[in-house]
A protein has these predicted regions:
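Amphipathic alpha-helical blocks and their helix-capping loop/short-beta junctions
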Residues: 118-145
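N-terminal leader/linker segments that precede catalytic domains of diphosphate-processing enzymes
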Residues: 1-54, 58-113, 123, 143, ...
Length: 175
């Protein structure tokens, strides 16, 4: 499964100034299964309430580019220590429709054991889907939306959709 990730760029698109960054945390569990960490945002959040998302957010002073933002946010939201993170590269920046933010997805392998500590304020739930399931085109569905297909994935009774679904599909070569 790690071989499927070889297409990841080593740098973000030149000239793009990201307004946000997310960490796409990937790890191998103790059974040798490759998984991803996703979170569900609480319904009380002012933006993206109830959405399934990667840890991430807007830059703050002192962040060292998109990687610094993604690492800080992942630590704040789910307790991933920066020392556990091996950045593999970047996906193309994603322009979110709802807030027109340019988001840089930072893809990283996370060292285990993974001892997550979700922020009660920012995380309602943590998911650990297997990459092999997310990479299965048969498990995805779509609805026509404007000029595009809005892809979605059933994730333990919740729906992975929108920009996060687009990032997952880009990562796994499904787009």
């Amino acid at each position: 499964m790690w071989d499927q990730l070889r297409h990841i760029d080593t740098f973000p698109e030149p000239g793009e100034k990201p307004q946000a960054a997310v960490l796409i945390p990937i790890y191998e569990d103790d059974q040798g299964v490759i998984r991803m960490v996703l979170t569900k945002r609480p319904d009380t959040m002012p933006t993206h309430a109830g959405h399934i998302a990667f840890p991430g957010g807007r830059p703050e002073p002192g962040d060292d580019g998109p990687v610094g933002t993604a690492l800080r946010e992942a630590h704040e939201e789910v307790g991933i220590e920066p020392e556990q993170v091996d950045v593999l590269g970047f996906l193309e920046p994603i322009d979110t429709v709802e807030f027109t933010l340019m988001v840089v997805p930072v893809v990283a392998r996370i060292a285990t054991p993974l001892d997550l500590v979700p922020s009660e304020r920012e995380v309602a739930r943590v998911y650990h889907p297997r990459l092999v399931d997310l990479a299965d085109p048969e498990q995805w569905a779509f609805v026509p939306w404007q000029a595009w297909k809005a892809w979605y994935f059933d994730l333990e009774g919740d729906t992975l959709w929108g920009a996060t679904a687009h990032m997952v599909r880009l990562l796994l070569g499904l787009n």
